[in-house]
């Protein structure tokens, strides 16, 4: 299996991401269950910070060195036509 990367990200309301992957699939990923603990502290309840999401090295990242593995996004995202 080839490595899956994120090619496009669009921030949705309620801490969700609309993602397009390197294999062409589109999925929506709900970040709410991930936003806890020190790694994600800056975005806890903070949509303004969450909206700063950007593509970085094939995945989604935020300022303050926050990112999430593309494999997690792909495996647990819900397919979006």
Predicted region positions:
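Motif-centric detector for short Cys/His coordination patterns
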Residues: 1-81
